[in-house]
Amino acid sequence: GQEQLLTDRAVFTDAYAVIPKGTMRDIVTSFLPFWDDTRLWVLSRPLSGFAETFSQYILEVAPNGGSDRPETDPQAQGVLFVVEGAATLSVDGAEHTLTPGGYAYLPPGKKWALRNNTDKMLRFHWIRKSYEAVEGLDLPDVIITNEQDITPTVMPDTEGKWATTRFVDPSDLRHDMHVTVVTFEPGAVIPFLETHVMEHGLYVLEGKAAYRLNQDWVEVEAGDYMWLRAFCP
């Protein structure tokens, strides 16, 4: 169609990777132990020459599917972000319904369960990272919220066209990972080349953009995923 990006966009380099939505087909799905009626696409995972610090998956959970033992690594913390359907998250003896935009932070060692108790497909992102403990700092608390309940922070020198929805206070050093929603209005430009210590995974929720990654310009659209090595401009 006239709206389809036509360039051959899948690329894997030492500094970044672009995984277009068109590569996420039925034949490349994976499965996890203790998850019923669930399949996933592994967008990144710790691997030499690739993501070093985190894993990111897109999971599809069919009606009545889910897991009562989702996390098998007691050192792993996790973030859930729902993009379609509704998830029932059980944690600390309470049930929470996560709808699109729903966010949950789950500290390491926390027992939780997730089910799709609806008759519709559930799709969500699961980001996992081994927690780096620091003596004198407690584990972070569970956070359950929705992006609609958070006021985005407008970034400086962008005429209000670039904003970031932060689920965690950047000054809370109990957290060693952050998942945010970044919004660009039409015509918005990042006014400098970002170069910093944070390794990135970026999933395009909606819209289209042109990104400068290292020395290359790449086109991305809704459903595409990018991984950026630490310090990659």
Question: Where are the model-predicted features located?
Answer:
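A short, N-terminal "cap"/entry segment at the start of jelly-roll beta-barrel domains
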Residues: 1-53, 119-176
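Conserved short histidine dyad/triad with adjacent acidic residue
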Residues: 37-46, 55-74, 165-168, 180-196, ...
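N-terminal regulatory/effector-sensing and dimerization cores
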Residues: 65, 69, 76-78, 86-90, ...
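Glycine- and acidic-residue-biased ligand/ion/polar-headgroup-sensing regions
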Residues: 75-88, 92, 197-214
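Short acidic-glycine-tyrosine-enriched beta hairpin
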Residues: 93-108, 214-232
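Asparagine-centered strand-capping/turn motif at beta-strand->loop junctions
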Residues: 114-118
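Surface-exposed interaction/gating patches
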Residues: 144-200, 205-211, 218
